[in-house]
Amino acid sequence: MSLISAVEDRDIHNIGKTSGGGSRTSSITSSKKSLKHGSKSLRKPKVYQTTGEPLSREALYKAKLKYGVYQSPAQSYSIGVSDAHAASDKAANLAHDNQTTVEAYKRMFIDPNATKAASKMGPKVVRNNSITSATSKTSKESQTKRKSKESPGAAASKAYSMTMETTSLSSQTNSRSYSITSASSVLSGASGSFNSTVNPKPKTLNLEKVLVGAEKKAESRIKERWEPEKTNFQYGVKTDEHGNLNQFSFSNEMMNNIMAKVDAPKAQDLQKVKKVSAEKEAKSMKFALGAANAVKDMHPGADIDKSIALKAQKRETYLSQLTSQQVLTLARANVDRQLDIIEKSDMHRKLFTNMEYNKAAVAVAQSNHQKKTEFHNKINMGGGLFLSPEDITKIASGLISPVLGEVSERAEAQRAMDEEIAERTEAYNKSLNEWETMERSIISNDAKVLTTTANRHQTEKKTSQEKIKASFDALVARMDTKVAERETLLEDTKNKEIEFKKQMQQELKDEKARLDQDLEEWGKKCEQDITEARKEQEELLKPYHDDLANAEAEHKTLVEERDAINAEISRLQDAIVDHKRKISGYGNDLDAQKNRNIREDDKLLELGQTKESLESHLNDDVIILANKAKEQAELSTKEARLKQLEVDSLINERKSELNATEIELKKEKLNLLEAMKDVASARGDDKIAEEKVKKLIGMTSEEYLTQNKSVEKNVEDLPTQLEKIEEGDELKKEEIVGAETKNSGGDGVPVSTGAKEAAETSSAVQTKEPEEKISIGNKSSGKEDANDCESAEHSKEISVSQKAGNNKSLGVSPDSLEHTFSGFSQGSSIEDDQDAISNQEKK
């Protein structure tokens, strides 16, 4: 059994057609292609990515290029033609067809994109010559190709680039020449200007820059094709192997060394010689370029050296002879000589035209054939391994026999498994038949059971329906009797409710009349108290307008009182907010109670509550209304108190301003007395003029000073009096709070009269003068005690009436309680103060 098939006929045909230079590599690749397992035809490779999608055309092309499907650059020919038989004829034809005129070297095949770009720029645009670097990255093979394809004036252009440029050419072409291509482009422009008769065509378009760019692009493309980047593909997946594809590319030098059988040291010496010559050429070009750049900016009319003029003249004559017949013949001779050199240098590659080389090759082949007799009737496995067909069959049997044994074992196991499957299917079919018979019997039995159960259910249903109907009739009769009893009870409760509502309305009217009478009496009492307080204030305010010290003390006390009033205002505002919140809560409770009454009315139809439960719920409603009326009364008192305090604060501010002006007046009088004393002392008098002092102040200086001393004593006694007054105020406030808590702790009846009287008395005490505050506080405390007694009696009466089910304050609303605040309950009015001041000044 052989693992290697014979070589196909088409591969043998390709092997016979290969040239001498590429015979070895092409035979290897063809033999590799022919080593296929079996004699099947080549199928199109199907390469997919990891995701299952096929690769792109570019990836397939690069993969084929990697594995040698296409002719790689390592197997191509750098010089000459592919067919060695027609090499000499092809060279002769090219030399004959190549015309040695300037017109023949126009580029006939130009990239259409380049022509489009140049035509867009327009014919009037003057293009500068391109500047290319002296050290080009092109390989030596591309340079030799370009040398063979250049015009006959290439050598002259090279010499021209190494010489100096004249001033006339520098004015026309403002560019530097760094390479042979740029020098040739400049030469073509200069020759056109010198010999216009030879080439009379007008210069319509300058494509030099475009062509140079196209040439660079072509060189880069050739380099990419010659040395492509190795993109490592393995069925579309990249690996970590990197490097160039042409790792073992056969260059021209390598092929020359292989065919000439040159040793390694000789090849190295040859490379060194070539490197030195290239460096010399580069240096000479550099020196020539420096010289040309040195004289390019010289003016044409300036005097120059004779030697330079002679060189320029020789150069002009040389340039004028470039297009002559002699130059053309010399150029043709140079081309022929160069072609002969190329043919002679490549004679060792021409296997079919060189008979001597063919004879030597046949001799070498015979000697190699004699040496290879040891590998007769053996197959080349590659890598220097030759095996006989017997060895290959042994290896194949050793590799395949274990596989065949495994196949036989698996076949036996499969047969046993098939037998077991057949037995299992037979047993399964038997059990399935038994199961089907059992199912049929079950279905028939179920049909019988269903009929019997249906009959039994019908009889049970009839009996149960009769029982339910009898029980339902009894329930309906029983519930009808209950409904009649509840309806009679409901009528009785409705009649009682109507009578109770009438009774409550009459009591509310009586209570409202009594409260109105109390309010009128209380208003009269308040007016009398206000008039008495005003009289007392007028009597007490007279002495304080005369004293400076007392005015200062009063100013301080008023400031303190203002702060206390502001604190009281803030506290009362908080209390008002609290009372409003409570009133809103009571309103919510009333709404809830109304909803509850509605629910209770509905429940009366179903449950039939008794009279006691209805009376208890109605009492709760009355209590909530009483609490609401109480909070509204307290709110009205607090609002009245707040307004009184605001007015008191305004009065105190006015009085503080008045006292400040009086203090300033007293200070000015003292300053006047001091100034008069200074004037008298300056004159030498011991006393001042008392008559002038009386006219200005209204009293003598001694009287004024004694009066000020008494004021100072009064000022010293004021703090103790103020402390006592503050203690009295605190006691009164505590008593008022206690009375309110007592009233609130009762059954919810508001005691508005006592609270208002306490507020009036406390406000009157705060605005009276410091000397009389203690006595006024005692009087007000007595009034408060009386009011507390009255409020206690009222609370007792109201509690008794509530127990009886009568509420006195049900019809009282916050709008019905009229405010009794007069606006000037504390302190004196501004007009009274002004009258007092005018009377004091008259005195």
From Swiss-Prot:
Membrane topology listed for this record: Peripheral membrane protein
Entry annotated with the keyword Nucleotide-binding: no
Coiled-coil boundaries: none
Record GO biological process: eisosome assembly
Cystine pairs: none
Region described as Disordered: spans on this chain: 1-53, 120-174, 718-843
Biased composition (Basic residues): 33-46
Modified residues (Phosphothreonine): 720
Modified residues (Phosphoserine): 2, 88, 130, 182, 401, 584, 710, 763, 775, 816, 828-829, 838
Key words of the record: Acetylation, Cell membrane, Membrane, Phosphoprotein
Pfam families: Eisosome1
Modified residues (N-acetylserine): 2
Compartment(s) where it occurs, according to its Swiss-Prot or TrEMBL record: Cytoplasmic granule; Cell membrane
Presence of the UniProt keyword Acetylation in the record: yes
Biased composition (Basic and acidic residues): 781-797
InterPro entries found in the cross-reference section: Eisosome1 (IPR024527)
GO cellular component: plasma membrane
Role description: Required for normal formation of eisosomes, large cytoplasmic protein assemblies that localize to specialized domains on plasma membrane and mark the site of endocytosis.
Family note: Belongs to the EIS1 family.
Family matches, as PANTHER family: EISOSOME PROTEIN 1
Protein name per the record: Eisosome protein 1
Species, as recorded: Saccharomyces cerevisiae (strain YJM789)
Annotated gene: EIS1
